Amino acid sequence: MGGTFDPIHYGHLVAASEVADLFGLDQVVFVPSGQPWQKDRHVSAAEDRYLMTVIATASNPRFSVSRVDIDRAGPTYTRDTLRDLHALNPDSELFFITGADALASILSWQGWETLFELAHFVGVSRPGYELCREHITGVLGELPDDALTLVEIPALAISSTDCRQRAAQRRPLWYLMPDGVVQYVSKRRLYRAEPGPAVAVTETRLSTGDHP
């Protein structure tokens, strides 16, 4: 599952769980982007976003977090993400889960022509968001029917944008994201106007504990 995860919230986790159940996936790998090339806003430090994702997914043995995008130099392109994941899992069939709104702009993605050769795409959307195949016309209209699946996830009514705004306004984040992520956001003073404390996170390692 690719995304900025700035911050990760229950919508992401429910979407991952639902898609895993729908397609019978053995595991879901969350891949926080390193340097998102399409974002027109400031994005939190990659290590903060990575650690929040680790915290959020730690209790689910089917979930894991990859650093392939964070550790790769330069802007994050989905093509490179999928190639790296293929190299790490050469015998696995890949399903790339991303927001349906991102799929709407797929023709502007770097190397989009090769993306559907690398993975089956699953676009997850919030309730009421309409994305028809006609929105991604042209060559993509010739894709096999099983190349792209759109799934509506009610929990995606929660958004990272709203979570950031609530944090900036000192409003509660409880029940929008896992408790550990709420505490991390508070401790690191993320999304606040004033700079946060000088806390080094580059070498931080979290113990996720043993899974049942």
UniProtKB/Swiss-Prot annotation:
The organism's place on the tree of life at top rank: Bacteria
InterPro entries referenced in this protein's UniProt entry, alphabetically: Cyt_trans-like (IPR004821), NadD/NMNAT (IPR005248), Rossmann-like_a/b/a_fold (IPR014729)
Pathway terms, separated by semicolons: Cofactor biosynthesis; NAD(+) biosynthesis; deamido-NAD(+) from nicotinate D-ribonucleotide: step 1/1
Pfam families: CTP_transf_like
EC number(s) stated in the UniProt entry for this protein: 2.7.7.18
GO BP: any one term: NAD biosynthetic process
Catalytic activity: nicotinate beta-D-ribonucleotide + ATP + H(+) = deamido-NAD(+) + diphosphate
UniProt GO MF annotations: ATP binding; nicotinate-nucleotide adenylyltransferase activity
Keywords attached to this entry: ATP-binding, NAD, Nucleotide-binding, Nucleotidyltransferase, Pyridine nucleotide biosynthesis, Transferase
Enzyme class name: transferase
UniProt cross-references to HAMAP family, sorted A to Z: NaMN_adenylyltr (MF_00244)
Family (UniProt): Belongs to the NadD family.
Main function: Catalyzes the reversible adenylation of nicotinate mononucleotide (NaMN) to nicotinic acid adenine dinucleotide (NaAD).
Protein name: Probable nicotinate-nucleotide adenylyltransferase
Organism annotation: Mycolicibacterium paratuberculosis (strain ATCC BAA-968 / K-10) (Mycobacterium paratuberculosis)
